[in-house]
């Protein structure tokens, strides 16, 4: 098992927002928001720019009408 951390998520996602492709002002996004029971697991965390994170807010990507360019996954060693 590879431990989850911000740098590893960014690296997995090629340091780009999974919603718009921006490489600026990167943050982490919970696909299923934490406030709605989302976990801190690899498959629920993605790289997201600040703008898209604000737009998505407390919604799922579907609810926010935002498409992910990649599906989050657990990387291999």
Residue spans for each PLM region:
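Short, charged surface segments at domain edges that flank catalytic/cofactor-binding sites
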Residues: 1-16, 39, 74-76
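Histidine-centered nuclease catalytic patch
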Residues: 16-47, 56-72
């Amino acid at each position: 098992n590879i431990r989850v951390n911000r740098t590893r998520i960014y690296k997995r996602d090629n340091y780009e927002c999974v919603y718009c492709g921006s490489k600026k002002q990167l943050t982490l996004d919970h696909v299923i928001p934490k406030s709605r029971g989302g976990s801190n697991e690899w498959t629920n965390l993605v790289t997201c720019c600040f703008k898209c994170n604000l737009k998505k807010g407390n919604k799922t990507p579907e609810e926010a009408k935002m498409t992910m360019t990649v599906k989050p996954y657990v990387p291999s060693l």
